Amino acid sequence: MWKVASSGRGILKTYVQDHDEDLYRRGMYTFIKRTVPPPTMLMFDASPRDICEVTRHSTNTPLQALIMLNDPTVLEAARVLADQLLKEQTSTEGKIQKSYRLILGRRASSEEIAIMVNYHSKQLEYFGNSSEQAEQFIAIGEYPMEEIKDKVELAALMQIVHTIYNLEEAITKT
């Protein structure tokens, strides 16, 4: 898409992803071609760069769900938060409660905690039976990781955080 809609020559010929510190800059420093904005931004109702918009329309579409489930940015954010939570000496319930506070800005209900604890145990079982899957899952993204003691636990907690990121409340209201 980038190549077809661009002039097809020079440095704008192809999109080149940044790395290291440049990869984690604020969105306002993202290079955007006026004729071809990043598709993810379009899916989440970012205003076009060729006109000024006073209000922004808010939609909720299947493509947004697809992006939230598969985009390396979201998965990497889930991994980094899960890694931070693992360093804390709290119970699984405490880690889930903290992730709700950090992502949604509210405390999780006892029912939500019970559902997530159950899901966490299923993910522990799944990744415990498939350590290769756990390693592939936590390898998404470029953010450096320290030595990981328990890859299965990190992958399971990453799934919990990723699930919270994918709640409608997280996507459209925060």
Residue ranges of each PLM-predicted region?
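An acidic, gly/pro-interrupted, aromatic-rich
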Residues: 1-95, 143-174
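C-terminal structured "cap/appendage" subdomains that terminate the fold
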Residues: 86-157
